[in-house]
C-alpha cells in the first residue's frame, strides 16, 4: 500500500481509539521471521522492500506486546529470522541473514511520522517504543531475561539499545520534511 493509502486507513481508524482513556501507543517490532512474510499479530508489517502491509485492521486489538495491546498500534518489520543476542559487555548481536533493510527502516520512520501527525501524539519514547524498550519496562527485556529485544539495534554494529532513538530521530526528520521545516 502507498503512504497515502496508509494515512487514509489511519484517519478512518482514529475515532475507534477515542474509547481508550490513554493516548495511543505505538509498539515497534520485528517478526523474527523471513522477509516477505506478514503476521496477523501486528496491524502493519513492512517487507524487505519497504512495502506496507495491513495484516490486522487498526480497529482490532493486536496480540503483540505483553499487557500493552489495548489502545495500541503494532508495527513489525518482516525480518530477523535466526537473530541472536547475548548479554555481555558489549552485547553480542547477530541479526541473522535477514536483518532490517534500509528500506524497512526508512518506511517505518515515515509510518511513525504519519501516525504522529494523524493521532496528534509526539514522537517520543512514551508514545513510540520498540518492543525491547517496552519489555525492559515490564521485566522481560534485554536488561533482564532478554526474551524480547526487537529493534534494540537496527544493524549488527549499532550501539546496544540505540534502535528506538534512531527510529524516533528519523521519524522526526520525516515529519519536519512533511511540515516544510
Predicted stretch roles:
Residues 25, 72-74, 127-129:
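Structural preference for beta-strand elements that scaffold enzyme active sites
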Residues 1-69:
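N-terminal catalytic cores of peptidoglycan-degrading enzymes
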Residues 1-20, 83-181:
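Basic/polar, cationic surfaces and motifs that engage anionic cell-wall
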Residues 45-103:
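Peptidoglycan-targeting cell-wall enzymes and recognition modules
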Amino acid at each position: 500500500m502507498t503512504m497515502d493509502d496508509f494515512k487514509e486507513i489511519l484517519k478512518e481508524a482514529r475515532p475507534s481509539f477515542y474509547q481508550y482513556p490513554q493516548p495511543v501507543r505505538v509498539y515497534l517490532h520485528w517478526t523474527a521471521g523471513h522477509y516477505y512474510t506478514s503476521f496477523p499479530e501486528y496491524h502493519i508489517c513492512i517487507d524487505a522492500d519497504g512495502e506496507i502491509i495491513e495484516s490486522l485492521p487498526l480497529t482490532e486489538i493486536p496480540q503483540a506486546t505483553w499487557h500493552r495491546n489495548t489502545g495500541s498500534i503494532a508495527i513489525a518489520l518482516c525480518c530477523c529470522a535466526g537473530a541472536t543476542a547475548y548479554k555481555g559487555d558489549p552485547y553480542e548481536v547477530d541479526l541473522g541473514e535477514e536483518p532490517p533493510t534500509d528500506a524497512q527502516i526508512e518506511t517505518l520512520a515515515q509510518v511513525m511520522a504519519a501516525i504522529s501527525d494523524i493521532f496528534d501524539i509526539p514522537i517520543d519514547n512514551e508514545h513510540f517504543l520498540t518492543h525491547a524498550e517496552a519489555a525492559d519496562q515490564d521485566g522481560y527485556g534485554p536488561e533482564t531475561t532478554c526474551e524480547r529485544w526487537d529493534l534494540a539495534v537496527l544493524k549488527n554494529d549499532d550501539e546496544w539499545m540505540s534502535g528506538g532513538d534512531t527510529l524516533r530521530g528519523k521519524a522526526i526528520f520525516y515529519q519536519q520534511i512533511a511540515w516544510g521545516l
